[in-house]
A protein has these predicted regions:
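Long, intrinsically disordered, low-complexity accessory segments associated with secretion
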Residues: 1-189
Length: 189
């Protein structure tokens, strides 16, 4: 009779989670000179991270499908926060559930310098401004894909090379505050 039924496979309450704010840069930033000084807005994605373990009230294999996240509001009611599709996930593995984009955290990126050193070597400098309009301080992971062979010349914040072609910056942003990440990278193609 063409009906669709949804069945709850697994339910956890009071699951300890880590709320993460993530900005994903785009590969094209390093391919040519952008318009220095012209800011580009980037989305700040919101993730909840948790471990599928017994002590969190979970701890059993999760089949691929949709995971919905609910949160208690200030009046004790339960509010839908977001949902994401997951792959098959064994017990004791970590899940990252993307629940959407932050509306109270703003990211703007601009290229502040572009230098062609030779036919295949370039230096670029970027400024990533994060504005937090929340009533609490947050940390934002800024993930920057960088093509070619690259070397970080300088950075205002600590960073890690997460892959051959990517750097990750962790930027703390104060409550109702602004933080500016500045970095310069040399790329060889």
């Amino acid at each position: 009779n063409a009906q669709t039924k949804q069945v709850s496979m697994l339910e956890g309450t009071d699951v300890p989670t880590l709320k993460r704010y993530i900005v994903e840069g785009q590969q094209f930033y390093y391919r040519n000179q952008q318009h220095p000084g012209s800011p580009i807005k980037d989305l700040v994605q919101v993730y909840y991270q948790f471990k599928n373990e017994q002590k969190a009230g979970l701890g059993m294999p999760m089949p691929a499908g949709i995971v919905r996240v609910y949160q208690q509001d200030s009046k004790g009611g339960v509010q839908f926060v977001g949902e994401d599709r997951i792959m098959h996930t064994p017990k004791d593995e970590t899940l990252n559930i993307k629940i959407g984009n932050a509306f109270d955290v703003v990211c703007e990126r601009k290229q502040t310098d572009y230098l062609r050193i030779s036919s295949n070597v370039y230096e670029m400098e970027y400024e990533v401004t994060l504005r937090n309009h929340k009533s609490s301080a947050i940390n934002v992971d800024v993930n920057e894909p960088i093509g070619g062979s690259w070397r970080m010349i300088r950075s205002s914040h600590e960073w890690t090379k997460t892959e051959a072609w990517a750097a990750k910056f962790n930027v703390p942003v104060a409550q109702d505050g602004t933080a500016v990440l500045k970095y310069r990278v040399r790329v060889t193609y």
